[in-house]
Amino acid sequence: MLEHNSKLFCKSLSQLSAVASKVVAEDVEGEHFKQLLAKCIDTLSIYKSELRKLSCASKDTPPSQIYQLNETLYVYYKIVSQIASQVIPGLAEFQQIKMNSKKDSKDKELLEIYSRLVSALANDKQIGEVKRFIKNHSEEAAHDGTQHSYENGEFVSISQLHSLIRHDNDSSGILLVDIRPRMDFNDGHIKHNNVICIEPISFKESYTDSDILRKSLITASDREVDLFKNRDKFRLIVLYTDTDEHTKYYWQQLEVLQDILCNRSFDKPLHHTKVIVLQNGVNAWKEKYPMELKKIMESAISDIRTKPVEHNFHPMALSNNNNIEKANSPSHSQTTSFTHYPDAPFLTNGASIKTAGLVPNQLLPSTSNLTKALQQNDEGNSEPYKLQPNGIKNHRQESNNHANGTNCIVSSNGNNSVAKSGHPSINLDFAIGLVNLGNSCYLNCIIQCLLGCHELSYIFLTNSYRKHVNVNSRLGSKGLLANYFSQLVQKMYQQGKLQAYNNTNMESTAVHPTQFKLACGSINSLFKGKQQQDCQEFCQFLLDGLHEDLNQCGTNPPLKELSPEAEKMRETMPMRIASAIEWERYLTTDFSVIVDLFQGQYASQLRCKICAHTSTTYQAFSVLSVPVPRARSCTIYDCFKEFTKLETLEKDELWYCPYCKQRQPSTKQIIITRLPNNLIIHLKRFDNMMNKNNVFVNYPNELDLTGFWIDDYNGEMPKDNGVSLPLRGQKPPFNYRLFAVASHSGTLYGGHYTSFVDKGRVGWCSFDDVSWRKIRRKDEYITPNAYVLFYRRVNM
């Protein structure tokens, strides 16, 4: 505490930090890990005791005592923080314990105590108030700040930062960290050579500096990543954000990041780097120095995110011709190789819907082309190529076809097999076990099954998915899930090759999916702990998450509801046409390779038994859940019959008919309107009370679902429609071949998941966590325990 002209001041943060540093230097020399931990715990206990004294202070407490308490608190906290973040990590003993894979119980206990200590420091809410009090009650620096010895957490004014940047001649002394969404950063940030963006949503209090590097900079450029890697080389790190009323969360996250850098920098402790904060934020900077802002042009960030692009497609007229155009029509020959990713379809702000909202005014590129582009775009193949969307012809073809009366539904090649020109050195039928992390067999079995889909494996093995990560997708994880899934797939591939080459022990080469599971848990807390989960729920979560990360239309506004007039007209159409229109609408907000590979569509139709009017809703699906009839045995076809059977709604289930204007007896039916390229069937064995139906469902290796696909097109087309509708692979027959089975034994909470996967030339294999083997009999994968079935479409 200082006194100047009879006025009390706190010592500055730098002075108090110097006191703490002196204590640490004199008091901890030569001490071991355990002794240092004991010293930290004792000091932290005193710190807590002093906090209680401060909280009990009243209006009558002398100011000098308040000042002294705050100074004491800061010194005690700083002592513990310096020992935990600088002294202990520098101990050879500590590093040896950390690196030792066979830790004894004492070492584990010490590391656990250390972890709790670091957590207590990181989660301390009072130290921020203490720092603010000291800053507000210490003498201000009289100069402009360029020579000022800053301390961690200190505020710097707009003018001071401007002066600091001007005097940073070699651009190596200051690193600016913009804590706002990347779109805001791209729209305008403080002009400086060394500036990075760390989005507020990308980190949390429990992170360390290495977590920031691994998890929070996914959307950053290589330049930004390099700057953060060299953060300890800068004299100052300046944090800034927005300070508007609606951005309070950003400011909270700024304080979290400040704490991480100051107190949780274990990978690269900031011994000589100070972390300071821009007062009043970037808003005030814009007002005072509008010319000192920098924007990032879209072309410069195209490798980070995919921007929506408006397509100048020429809509084709709908015709009343009775014949649907054949898929092998010469006028629809498909380009078989793409070397550039197709642009994302974009729903413009002024997008209109033809015929009272029935047909989008733009058709989207074929999603199967998206898959092929991903599969064939290797790292060395970056030559631009203008994509001709499948199902959309050029203007000359349009005019000719219109004159010749070509048809409403335009064909689209539905073959989504891996390109024959695929990477010859990649064996997509690799096999490797996955370690059970504690009831994580639900995760292991789904991963094994999904990797039976070669298209999916190829995309994530070759990193071609990266070009389609949309970090601005509203429901995505900013690429987090996709990146960790790719890392897991690549690790499995590498270990599978190693095991096959060296014929090594399965347990020693099995992959630990730890980081991937952590990523899943950070997105959905359901998968965070070690409780058993439903594997089909995890399958749905994973496919949905990957879709949102790769969703090229993830930033488009949600679809508007149809007007009553449009709904009424939709009900008069053949369901084949209405469902195609609805699918095109759906693709304006959901367009990804996952949609192409796995998503289908069904209609739920209500029909009034009095007036016969209908109301139909269309639903996309990635996993199709079908009921299992209660019988001694049944076939998969019985499940589909149960799924699509006509139900009668009476008594307590009366439907409110909008035409009769009252509740009426009605019928309800599910109708499959679109079958995907890879069909995932969930056998609903558990009822609402979690009781399991163990009936044996006989499912074939070859499955024909043509009879369950709606085919009511009669050639009668709605009038005044201006756009042709692509088939997008919806052309019978719909024949499927089984490629994987997830099986479940026991109850939902006390059971175990295993899987069977068709590994091509190797044949069918059984996977049980770390263990895998070839099947012992040819039909072993036809099991009474089958829970989720994976089929791929053939002969398209």
From Swiss-Prot:
Residues 170-294 form the Rhodanese domain. RFU1 is an inhibitor of deubiquitination activity. One of its GO terms (biological process) is proteolysis. The keyword Phosphoprotein does not apply. Its EC number is 3.4.19.12. SMART domains: RHOD (SM00450). GO terms for molecular function: cysteine-type deubiquitinase activity. CDD domains: Peptidase_C19R. Gene3D superfamilies: Cysteine proteinases, Rhodanese-like domain. The keyword Disulfide bond does not apply. It catalyses: Thiol-dependent hydrolysis of ester, thioester, amide, peptide and isopeptide bonds formed by the C-terminal Gly of ubiquitin (a 76-residue protein attached to proteins as an intracellular targeting signal). The active site is at C441 (nucleophile), H752 (proton acceptor). One of its GO terms (cellular component) is late endosome membrane. Keywords: Cytoplasm, Endosome, Hydrolase, Membrane, Protease, Thiol protease, Ubl conjugation pathway. It is a peripheral membrane protein. Residues 432-794 form the USP domain. It is found in: Cytoplasm; Late endosome membrane. It holds the Pfam family Rhodanese. Belongs to the peptidase C19 family. Ubiquitin thioesterase that acts at the late endosome/prevacuolar compartment to recover ubiquitin from ubiquitinated membrane proteins en route to the vacuole. Also removes ubiquitin from soluble proteins targeted to proteasomes. Is essential to maintain a normal level of free ubiquitin. Required for promoting coordination of DNA replication and avoids DNA overreplication. This is Ubiquitin carboxyl-terminal hydrolase 4.
